């Protein structure tokens, strides 16, 4: 059977899709690119915003257009909370929520895929407490890229921020033990990957049900031979302790790159969101990072148009973010999520105003990122060069292909503090680290 998959949403989803495809390939199936004709299409979905859900529907319809006779399996967060709706989309064969998506290889082996409702009961049609009972945790990692791997170390969340449906889609916080996680990390090292990105829904809560700590996991990972770099994909500000900051600053392999969600620069709005910090604590965390890692890259999530936010509070957010040593923003436009407490909060912001606020935050992000890049010019930073296809940059065109020997192509890499770098392609450098002086000629001004 030929299988193609499309992943929407977070790095956690990418790790899960990759692991699923690896298991399906081990069963003798052939994995093809998403835009190829396939016998089976898998859509791993996201429910974080209404826009994300729209993209999920579009992906399902695209698969059906590519091969109307193909079977389509929809998995993930949107599948967990909206199975009855998804089942009505033409072409959908099976809907598996987060609690049973790991069963797909077994379903295919047992030739049960034709039975439309064989696992749809796993996804609650509405957001209820029963959907919080996601039963087991599986350590998973992405495997397509030998340079950089996304490693799922934690799942679920206990925070129940008023705007967020993810705890209903993924359950409460759960993880493996440190020993089990380190064992999987050694397997990743054996695969040849040099950089590992630790992913989860709320990574800082790792190990709580085992009376273990995230910091102790970091210490164990730092001792694993073969892995040269680790990044923490995201950590809540109230969980980013001084001990974690100090450890990262002096560790062997953890990089000066943090993603610290903010969401708003107004204490009143943060309270409405049920965030577990205020602006004073958030500023203190960033100052602590910069005190020991002055060149660290710090990214932040920010939300535009949350219910009840006034224009004055939005302006306060702009001014607050502008005053922080933030390198760039991930901007989300608020949308109502069924079953969340935010539906009952304050006056709804008109959609055009939400989009205007989003645009202003994106402009601020661009300015902050340019300033961060400018602060790094002339400095020497270690770059991990990526394997993979050669890319054309700096104005080269496809029409010049007859003039394009390998030396006209470039390879890409990331500095330790998350700046995108390019250089003329050299196969010998792939998956190695090289110290590079940063200039306007070798920096690509992109965020990923």
State what each model feature region is.
Residues 1-112:
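Cofactor-cradling patches in redox/metallo enzymes
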Residues 72-73, 81-82, 190-311:
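Conserved SAM/AdoMet-binding glycine-rich loop
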Residues 60, 185, 218, 245, ...:
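Generic structural signal for well-ordered alpha-helices
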Residues 108-150, 441:
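N-terminal [4Fe-4S]-dependent radical SAM core
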Residues 10, 207-226, 273-276, 336-367:
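Radical SAM enzyme [4Fe-4S]-AdoMet core and its adjacent flexible, acidic
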Residues 344-402, 406-448:
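Terminal RNA-binding accessory module
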Residues 168-197:
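Conserved alpha-helical substructure of the radical SAM core
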Residues 144-179:
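Canonical Radical SAM [4Fe-4S] cluster-binding loop centered on the CxxxCxxC motif
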């Amino acid at each position: 059977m030929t299988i193609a998959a499309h992943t929407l949403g977070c790095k956690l989803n990418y790790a899960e899709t990759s692991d699923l495809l690896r298991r399906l390939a081990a069963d003798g199936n052939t994995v093809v690119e998403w835009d190829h004709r396939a016998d089976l299409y898998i859509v791993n979905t996201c429910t974080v915003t209404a826009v994300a859900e729209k993209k999920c529907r579009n992906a399902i319809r695209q698969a059906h257009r590519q091969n109307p006779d193909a079977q389509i399996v929809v998995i993930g967060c949107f599948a967990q909370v909206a199975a009855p709706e998804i089942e009505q989309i033409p072409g959908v064969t099976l809907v598996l929520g987060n609690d049973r998506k790991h069963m797909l290889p077994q379903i295919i082996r047992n030739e049960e895929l034709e039975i439309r409702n064989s696992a749809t009961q796993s996804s609650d049609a509405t957001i209820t407490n029963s959907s919080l009972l996601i039963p087991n945790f599986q350590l998973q990692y992405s495997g397509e890229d030998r340079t950089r791997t996304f490693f799922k170390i934690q799942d679920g969340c206990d925070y129940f921020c008023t705007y967020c449906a993810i705890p209903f889609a993924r359950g409460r916080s759960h993880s493996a033990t440190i020993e089990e996680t380190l064992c999987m990390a050694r397997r990743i090292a054996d695969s040849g990957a040099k950089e590992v990105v630790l992913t989860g829904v709320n990574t800082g809560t790792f190990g709580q049900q085992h009376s273990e700590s995230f910091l102790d996991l970091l210490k164990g990972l730092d001792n694993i031979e073969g892995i040269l770099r680790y990044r923490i994909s995201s950590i809540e500000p109230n969980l980013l302790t001084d001990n974690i900051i100090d450890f990262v600053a002096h560790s062997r392999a953890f990089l000066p790159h943090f993603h610290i969600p903010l969401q708003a620069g107004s204490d009143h709005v943060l309270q409405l969101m049920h965030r577990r910090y205020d602006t004073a604590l958030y500023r203190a965390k960033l100052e602590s990072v910069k005190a020991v890692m002055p060149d660290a890259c710090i990214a932040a999530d920010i939300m535009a148009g949350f219910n009840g936010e006034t224009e004055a509070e939005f302006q306060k957010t702009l001014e607050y973010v502008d005053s922080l040593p933030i390198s760039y923003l991930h901007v989300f436009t608020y949308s109502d999520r069924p079953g969340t407490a935010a539906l009952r909060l304050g006056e709804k912001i008109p959609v055009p105003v939400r989009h205007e606020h989003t645009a202003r935050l994106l402009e601020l992000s661009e300015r902050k990122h340019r300033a961060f890049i400018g602060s790094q010019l002339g400095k020497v930073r270690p770059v991990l060069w990526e394997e993979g296809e050669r890319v054309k940059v700096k104005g080269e065109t496809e029409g010049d292909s007859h003039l394009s020997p390998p030396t006209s192509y470039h390879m890409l890499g990331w500095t330790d503090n998350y700046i995108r770098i390019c250089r003329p392609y050299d196969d010998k450098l792939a998956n190695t680290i090289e110290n590079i002086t940063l200039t306007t000629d070798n920096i690509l001004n992109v965020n990923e």
